[in-house]
Regions:
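Terminal amphipathic alpha-helical/low-complexity segments used for targeting or macromolecular assembly
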Residues: 1-210, 355, 360, 366, ...
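Surface-exposed, flexible loop/turn segments at secondary-structure boundaries
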Residues: 11, 62, 225, 242, ...
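Activation segment
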Residues: 65-66, 229, 246, 263, ...
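Acidic, glycine-rich loop-and-beta core segments that form the ion-binding/anion-interacting portion
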Residues: 216-275
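Glycine-rich hexapeptide-repeat left-handed beta-helix
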Residues: 256, 271-399
């Protein structure tokens, strides 16, 4: 079946890229769409066919191959409609019409349009209950929705996070489904191969055996890398920790750095002792030493200095963000910040949750207490005279 992509003209701050250039795993949204279409047996064409039914979709919607197969199997005509309440509640925020993703099947000769009757599609999702790690943030825990039939619009920077996390889930779910559908002998050989690589039945050893590592990678013997996909020429330093991550070509994970369930782009760098969870680093981004970052997006060639901080958890109401020029609820209590392309964040800068730093911005912390020269006989300041410390004299209050 043929497929036609229609342009939405969508951009969103802080990145302002054409939406098709949004980073999804190791490529772009446009590339992810094309890969899913190919895997599902669709051929992307420039104009609508006149002699056969076809698929039409927006350039701002992400989907899996399993979702496309499900749509085609309906045999109907119309725009996809989803009725799963859990999916709409968890994935709906900041989407224009989450119940009607911008994907449709059209009859032969019909003009490429996303208008039309509803075409019900069952995503067959599973919702695992949230794991409450601590009562203090039980209010922020959300159920994990999993499956292989996934679709999501990309209209806000928070969607970059959500879609990348969904893509990670879909990658694991599709591998699991492929394994379960294979013949018994093939599954047995696969299990034996994993156990031989793991040399153990312990979960951590098996997780290491599931890694996919490109050529030219350097992984220090003390580093822990589990259930990850590493591109070519990736460096992982001493005592670094990577769990459930996709890492692009030439990325560098320095000593004691920690990343979990994150996407680290080509040439990106995670500095010593830095921590990133549930985050996306565009190619060339550099998160410097120290500090913890969760649910954040770092733009292309962005730089974040040591001791910069972003809040990510609201203990009050849902976090509010800017969307289409208005401040609205993101309908979540757990969300970090977005750092624009080439933006620079200096030491000690503190950013509130939901904040978006524009492209090319340069933020520095207040510098009123920065010592710029040695004080000379200023009352209240410590000094040294002839090698002898002069006691500090308390400043007198102003009259």
């Amino acid at each position: 079946m043929l497929a036609v992509r229609v342009s939405s003209g969508t951009t969103f701050p802080p990145f302002d890229d054409a939406v098709g250039q949004t980073r999804i795993l190791t490529g772009t949204l446009a590339e992810a769409q094309e890969a899913a279409l190919s895997a599902a047996g669709f051929t992307l064409v420039a104009s609508a066919p006149t002699d056969a039914p076809y698929l039409v979709f927006s350039d701002r919607v992400w989907f899996t191959a399993s979702f496309l197969r499900c749509v085609r199997a309906t045999g109907g005509v119309g725009r996809v409609r989803i009725s799963d309440e859990t999916w709409l509640r968890e994935m709906g925020p900041l989407q224009t019409a989450p119940e009607r993703p911008e994907v449709a099947l059209l009859a032969a000769g019909a003009p490429p349009s996303l208008d039309g009757p509803d075409l019900p599609v069952d995503l067959q999702l599973r919702a695992a209950p949230p794991v409450v790690l601590h009562p203090a943030f039980a209010h922020a825990q959300r159920p994990l929705v999993t499956g292989t039939r996934l679709v999501h619009g990309v209209e806000h920077w928070s969607h970059v996070l959500r879609v990348n996390l969904l893509a990670l889930v879909a990658t694991a779910e599709e591998a699991k489904a492929e394994f379960e559908a294979s013949p018994f002998w093939k599954r047995a050989l696969r299990v034996i191969g994993i156990l031989l690589r793991a040399r153990s039945i312990k979960p951590h050893a098996i997780a290491r055996a599931l890694n996919r590592v490109g050529t030219g990678c350097t992984i220090h013997p003390t580093a822990v890398v589990e259930a990850c996909q590493l591109g070519n020429n990736v460096e992982v330093g001493p005592y670094a920790l990577l769990r459930g991550c996709i890492v692009g070509d030439g990325a560098k994970i320095e000593d004691y750095a920690h990343a979990s369930v994150s996407v680290i782009g080509a040439g990106a760098r995670l500095g010593r002792t830095a921590m990133c969870n549930f985050s996306v680093l565009y190619p060339g981004a550099f998160v410097s030493a120290g500090g913890g970052w969760q649910m954040c997006v770092f733009g292309r060639d962005a730089f974040v200095a040591m001791t910069a901080t972003a809040y990510d958890l609201s203990f009050g109401g849902p976090i509010r963000v800017v969307h289409r020029g208005a401040v609205v609820s993101a309908e979540t209590h757990f969300l970090g910040v977005a750092i624009g392309h080439r933006a620079k964040i200096g030491a000690h800068v503190k950013m509130g949750y939901g904040m978006a730093v524009p492209n090319d911005a340069f933020l520095v912390a207040p510098s009123g207490d920065v010592l710029r020269k040695w004080p000379d006989a200023i009352e209240g300041a410590a000094t040294v005279r002839d090698g002898v410390a002069v006691p500090v004299v308390a400043p007198k209050p102003a009259p």
